[in-house]
Amino acid sequence: MIQNVGNHLRRGFASMFSNRTSRKSISHPESGDPPTMAEGEGYRNPTEVQMSQLVLPCHTNHRGELSIGQLLKWIDTTACLSAERHAGCPCVTASMDDIYFDHTISVGQVVNIKAKVNRAFNSSMEVGIQVVSEDLCSEKQWSVCKALATFVAHRELSKVKLKQVIPLTEEEKTEHGVAAERRRMRLVYADTIKDLLTHCVIQDDLDKDCSNMVPAEKTRVESVELVLPPHANHQGNTFGGQIMAWMENVATIAASRLCHAHPTLKAIEMFHFRGPSQVGDRLVLKAIVNNAFKHSMEVGVCVEAYRQEAETQRRHINSAFMTFVVLDKDDQPQKLPWIRPQPGEGERRYREASARKKIRLDRKYLVSCKQAEVALSVPWDPSNQVYLSYYNVSSLKTLMAKDNWVLSVEISEVRLYILEEDFLSFHLEMVVNVDAAQVFQLLSDLRRRPEWDKHYRSVELVQQVDEDDAIYHVISPALSGNTKPQDFVILASRRKPCDNGDPYVIALRSVTLPTHHETPEYQRGETLCSGFCLWREGDQMTKVSYYNQATPGFLNYVTTNVSGLSSEFYNTFKACESFLLDNRNDLAPSLQTL
């Protein structure tokens, strides 16, 4: 249906306006003049590093498959070299985001690892890694995993200020834009776990029959490693990948003690390096099964370091959580025994493992799946608010980064672009004589939108989630052909620029709340992705860009109003400009933090 609507719109616009031009320059590079060749044959990201390794028997586990520990060492090395190529100085691993392993790699196959810097901040940078396995005989290739790592540049005598990454391709622009939101998500991860345990009821099953349960203490593992020169990089610091490999080893032993079989690692929760380790350090690795679910188990691993045996104070180096399964001969997960945690700290870890499992499921659904697979309205609750906000902002930035927008019409310096891919999307653009911070403050409060947008009859603030996220209940007039007015429950996520050249962002998407069910009085509407991106255009000038990814409910309105679509959008946007000009002087006290 969407494709037919797209064809209808294309013919309608073509008959109304001629000489449509492709939008060639919608991006806003951060600094410098980018090379003329952005895509096509021969282009390669200047920070890209590739590694190819033939899997030998010495790299494998009992199943003849590549050891995940060995893979982590290769991943870390490749990513570090990419980071150092951009930084021009030594770099150390700060963290590694969640990794989901989709396929195993067998002896004789080739591992192809590709890493590139997505974005640089002040002294840290996000590196994206892609791992593909290759069968040389059949010439088939499989995606094994994707990973995101954070590296910190380090110089002995001076403070590092990294140069900015200038994205050129559509993929690079998307990753660059979303990297800031991912960084925000990493910083609040610990608080997310605490909030979930505080405000949500976690089913812990601690009262069930203990007779057939395995005591968690039976799975406890402790192992020590002496850091030798081969374990360290060219700076004398222990390889992050080597530490991760040691952690995977003790975690596998702990998992095996629960299931009395050979487990398979399926996912790794975020690695976060809290401090460095050098040659000569003794690393103490501790692992224990925190919780066992029906077909999977979570193992917690902790790494501490000390220099001399006489030292009483150990340094906390790293912690991580790993998810294991036990596969049968058909590669299907087997049922696992229940685990009985120790009172006190053991029960705390048990409940936190349940909370992390819920977060993983929410995150995997919201972040990992394709946009077309996500429901228009996703249930909102404290356990997934961080990832809903992330998906809200990243969806808008992904739409913004598209490079095949087509200019449909321009009326008095208001431009309307359309994009026909999986969804039909619209983009309006104008420049206003108002400072970007003022525009951001005025447009981010949806309660003021009825002052200029006739499609918003009333707006109620339902919940102020945090300083930058809020949920609103919106009432809109009835669309043509309908007798009922529409209502929406909308999550609004606003973001200030992370760096020079970044836009202010106001992202909107529908959510569902238990306090605001559908009612007979209104027809429930939904929006998948819409919002504003605001760029500074010189002194007191702002480029205002509005994006909307049309949903099925909106498509009917579009198809029945093709002839008046452009003029109505123009009138609404000009009303927005008048609203901004009339109210720009009312915000001086509130702009201090922007």
Curated annotation (Swiss-Prot):
Residues 370-582 form the START domain. The modification Phosphoserine is found at residues 15, 25. SMART domains: START. Residues 45-157, 217-330 form the HotDog ACOT-type domain. Gene3D superfamilies: 3.30.530.20, Hotdog Thioesterase. Residues 20-43 are annotated as: Disordered. Keywords: Cytoplasm, Fatty acid metabolism, Hydrolase, Lipid metabolism, Mitochondrion, Phosphoprotein, Repeat, Serine esterase, Transit peptide. Pathway: Lipid metabolism; fatty acid metabolism. It is found in: Mitochondrion matrix; Cytoplasm. GO terms for molecular function: carboxylic ester hydrolase activity; fatty acyl-CoA hydrolase activity; lipid binding; long-chain fatty acyl-CoA hydrolase activity. PROSITE patterns: HOTDOG_ACOT (PS51770), START (PS50848). Its EC number is 3.1.2.-, 3.1.2.2. InterPro entries: Cytosol_ACT, HOTDOG_ACOT, HotDog_dom_sf, START-like_dom_sf, START_lipid-bd_dom, Thioestr_dom. GO terms for cellular component: cytoplasm; cytosol; mitochondrial matrix. Residues 1-20 form a transit peptide. CoA binds at residues 93-95, 122-124, 183, 272-274. One of its GO terms (biological process) is negative regulation of cold-induced thermogenesis. Induction: By cold exposure and repressed by heat exposure. It holds the Pfam family START. It catalyses: hexadecanoyl-CoA + H2O = hexadecanoate + CoA + H(+); tetradecanoyl-CoA + H2O = tetradecanoate + CoA + H(+); dodecanoyl-CoA + H2O = dodecanoate + CoA + H(+); butanoyl-CoA + H2O = butanoate + CoA + H(+). It comes from the Eukaryota. Its main location: mitochondrion. Has an acyl-CoA thioesterase activity with a preference for the long chain fatty acyl-CoA thioesters hexadecanoyl-CoA/palmitoyl-CoA and tetradecanoyl-CoA/myristoyl-CoA which are the main substrates in the mitochondrial beta-oxidation pathway. This is Acyl-coenzyme A thioesterase 11. It comes from Mus musculus (Mouse). The lineage of its organism: Eukaryota, Metazoa, Chordata, Craniata, Vertebrata.
